[in-house]
Amino acid sequence: MKSPRLVAYSPEVAAELGLSDQDCLSEDFCRVFAGNRLAAGMQPFAMCYGGHQFGHWAGQLGDGRAINLGEAVCPDGRRRTLQLKGAGRTPYSRSADGLAVLRSSIREFLCSEAMHHLGVPTTRALSVVLTGETVVRDMFYDGNPQLEPGAIVCRVAPSFTRFGNFQIFTARDDLDALKKIGGLHDSQRFSGIGRAGAADLSALVRGSLSLTAEMVVHWQRVGFVHGVMNTDNMSILGLTIDYGPYGWLENYDPDWTPNTTDAQGRRYRFGNQPKIAYWNLVQLANAIYPLVMRAESLQQALSVFSETFAAEWSATTAAKLGLSRFDPDKDEALVGDLLQLLQAAETDMTLFYRQLADLDPYAPAGSAADFVAMLERNSYAPLAAELRDRALAWFGQYCSRSRSEAGDPEARRQRMNAVNPKYVLRNYLAQLAIDQAEQGDFGLVAELLDVLRNPYSEQPGRERFARSVRIGPNSGRDVRCCLAVLDRAFTVFCSGYCTELPGWHTIVPFG
């Protein structure tokens, strides 16, 4: 690359890899993570994978612009793969240039680290480096391409193996390659998820099912919408991967997606993410079937998803409401009524749950007025009389349920604040940081990164980072902060690649 320049790095990821601040600020660091030179022991490679895009088999897809530098052994003995995204073409790039721009690289860098500190399983990001070169991109896909600053983000993960890495070899009937990739998932590296034998590959599916269910529960907990849950964007380890047109819910809307290419079908909308995750896992089971040849064992493995998701989501829902446990007989209706209320009032999900912790359900009835005021303060639609009545009724039920546990108010508040973040990476915040970075000022990127390291803490003096740009007397209801269309790092479904996969085994029917 022409003249690489460091934009930002993650001190936590660097420390995990055994790198000091001095290392990260060195010229060598910049050259290595711009792809200009290799450190000792690095052996770059790209991986071949296929996948289903928007429910259709799309053939071979990548790695189109991801280059693995190799595997690092951390000071604590753990292994981490380092991967450059945007460093140029690979043998699997097809017609693409393999490059990335600054805006998408900053979005991936900030979101990877934000998700980690939120407690969401994710790939990590070590650094963002400007390349000193420009890249042509049609930002709005309207036939008006422009030059943008190029950049490279360094991802870090135990493995970048995707569902699609298995799928492509099944599609090609290449059982030898399929066995090899299955054999890579040994107990030392992947904590016993699977080995190459048939029984162990069923265990691999079972382990991936459990990890994926836990990941999606966390997505739903914090209001994260991935946007492109194609099978090639699913990690075998249940890590959030490929941050393209992602977003966080502003107003609670289970039908919302930040991906403008999915605006009509809304396949990857917030409320559909658990179902899509399961659908993708069925495709993983299909891909592994030729090595197992026992549909029953895979069907048994697939049952893990619903069990794990239900258990994890029940516990998470209780914690979000400050309850010590989820009682289906009492709480299913309570939660259902709340979500309907939040949707009708267009309530900001993040702000609502965080501020609900500040209300005392054990106090006299006067706190009901405080609840309605809080709901109105954090809603994008005016509260009509009918919604106020519904809000009062719900809060009365919530207070009664909370009192039934005879809990301590402060313990309740702490329990809620441990799972309901104050700070998330709202799209407008990411865009403000990008705008400044494109002018050569990386200060807001650094400050945002620092704020997002402690999303559950109050952080006095930084309250502006918790605000929604849509709330306030001058915001207007038409202001939308979905800037996902600006991001080039997502795969658009191309009907030209849509073919049915021959010999596909249907393990579980799925509607």
Where in this protein do the model-derived segments appear?
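Hydrophobic residue at the +6 position relative to the catalytic HRD Asp in the kinase catalytic loop
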Residues: 229-234
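Short, well-ordered loop/turn and helix-capping segments at boundaries between secondary-structure elements
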Residues: 286-294, 358-362, 377, 400, ...
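Short, solvent-exposed positions on alpha-helices
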Residues: 82, 123, 227, 296, ...
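Conserved ATP-binding subdomain of kinase catalytic cores across diverse folds
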Residues: 3-6, 11-29, 33-197, 236-241, ...
